[in-house]
Amino acid sequence: MKKMPMRKRFGQHFLHDSFVLQKIVSAIHPQKTDTLVEIGPGRGALTDYLLTECDNLALVEIDRDLVAFLQKKYNQQKNITIYQNDALQFDFSSVKTDKPLRVVGNLPYNISTPLLFHLFSQIHCIEDMHFMLQKEVVRRITAEVGSHDYGRLSVMAKYFCDNTYLFTVSPQAFTPPPRVESAIIRLIPRHNFTPVAKNLDQLSHVVKEAFSYRRKTVGNALKKLINPSQWPLLEINPQLRPQELTVEDFVKISNILN
């Protein structure tokens, strides 16, 4: 079958290392009855492995040439549905299933953060997620309070999910090799986080505002939102830096604004 050219604007790096592919599938541990959604399947390297493990697989691919390639490659498969769609705009709840989705994929590095936020907005229909991401992004997601990598993505990811850094993948596992290392992460939705954010948009705004001034104290960083008299009510020291605040702290700040 004719190979498809890579498109730089889609951030395409195709995984080809069979050992890494098998390791990813083992981490996902798909079951026959699962409904899997693969984002950015490319030429189907991971898809081939997933098809042998589950009976319901959906592919979301934006590249029309790759969609045509995949349709031809899997035209005899009855357990696969291909959506030509931008994952940033895709309604994951539209996938026909009576079970929560298991979402997987080698996410394009140039859209990985906004795509994660899009998935967080649809977390109600997701059982878990396993992604290949730039190693730096995985470090930011899993960063602990007070660390250099702890920031907006860390806070929001921890609010929505329990996150586990699984393993690193070298550039040589891809064609063409990216200039950075990659890593596999597991994200399991948290449906009972406490305290509950009353307004998720407000929470996101507070976190974004705080980390826009991460070298300032949180009292100064959020002075447009929180007046000095409110900090004692929150039981948060306004002299702390944003990276020293827990997810719970940010939720409390967000909730006092509602």
Swiss-Prot record:
One of its GO terms (cellular component) is cytosol. S-adenosyl-L-methionine binds at H13, L15, G40, E61, D86, N106. Signal peptide: none annotated. It is found in: Cytoplasm. Specifically dimethylates two adjacent adenosines (A1518 and A1519) in the loop of a conserved hairpin near the 3'-end of 16S rRNA in the 30S particle. May play a critical role in biogenesis of 30S subunits. Belongs to the class I-like SAM-binding methyltransferase superfamily. rRNA adenine N(6)-methyltransferase family. RsmA subfamily. This is Ribosomal RNA small subunit methyltransferase A. It comes from Coxiella burnetii (strain RSA 331 / Henzerling II).
